[in-house]
Amino acid sequence: MRAFLLTASLCVGIAASAAAQAPTTPPPPPRTSGSTEPVGGLLPEPRALGKAVDYVDHWVGDDSESKDGFYPSIGGLITGAGWISGGPGFRKHFHDGQIFVDGAAQVSWRGYKVGQARFELPRLVGDRLTVGSQARWQDFTQIEYFGIGADSLEAGRSVYRLKDTDVLGYASYRANDWLSVGGRSGWLRHPSLGASSGPFKRGFPEALDVFPQDPGMGQTPDFLHGDVSVTADTRDHRGHPTSGGFYRAVAGVYSDRDLDQFTFRRYEAEGVQLVPVVGKSWVLAFHGWGVFSETSSGNEVPFYFLPSLGGQNTLRGYNSYRFHDRNLLMASAESRWALFRHIDGAVFFDAGNVAARVGDLDLKKTSYGAGLRLHTQRSTLGRVDVGHGTEGWRVWFRLDDPLQLARRAPREEIVPFAP
């Protein structure tokens, strides 16, 4: 808990220091139109690029309020699913938006599959309270695992398959335009572990064979889980933020209902701050994150629930899920320039580590690199990042922003822990 509070203080410090660096000139009022407003860039944008972005924006949307009917459900799966995923979705509002239902399915490049159905009451208590429920089934076919600890070896790379069903209820109360509190509770039907499968297998050994003694490799129980959170969000746009910040604190519990071996508690603190240096043409982004686990005597954290570091959103110079352990600390900084109206260039530096004990956490694992972001005014349509760490170069193609903060959503996957 002490480390949780320290990390929360660090996140607040990031916000304070970033605010101190911000220009004294008041920012322009938020834009409310779509991608047709010019944002500016160092170079004139080719007409074909602008038309292509507008076409995608028309069919996929631009981070605006969801519209009724069928829609393409694209992206948003966990690290390692492959560079693209998609499938059909359908949503419908009833009674002037008082009731919302949604269903979607996706298949990814590597055969990851997800299906979900959601029922929500989004406008209770004067549009401040949202209450909902969701059933989610998922089958992740090739999740990477390197063993536990900061000293795990790259040569120990293995894969496993994870299938599970989770049913949960959630609620969120919006105190004002930027502050909300929330909670969720659910039942995770015992995760099924197996041999990897699906297209584009890379020939790595099976985790069940390489790490048979790691916690959770044998029997998998049902879990009753729940958490509470406090969130402050002042970003101008969720999908392509250029100003504002996002700060979150979460406390959760996961209760083993069958074996009495894997009950644990988790605490998270996370902060992101966007600092416009020259309007929206040059933006600095800072990200800090800490995750801490506690267990009672005789209990352990299953390996698929262990905080993990490495991949497209954290240490971009390392493989996905490169480091696992009970506790995690990470910080990163990114500088973005508008090259064209719809393309930003970026350079970044990431640092972090994992540890069994909170007192052993440090930021000794580092990576750096550069990338490009294709976006509308409100949403990131795609990005490529090239990162370098002590284990070489890594290239990432994704359909979201590296600061998308997927784990903040109450309806996302419970397992595995995906950075």
What does each of the following model-derived ranges do?
Residues 21-132, 193, 208-242, 310-312, ...:
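Outer-membrane beta-barrel initiation region
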Residues 114-119, 143-151, 193-202, 241-243, ...:
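Outer-membrane beta-barrel translocator domains and adjoining extracellular loop/strand segments
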Residues 129-170, 290-309, 382-405, 412-419:
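Outer-membrane beta-barrel translocator/channel fold
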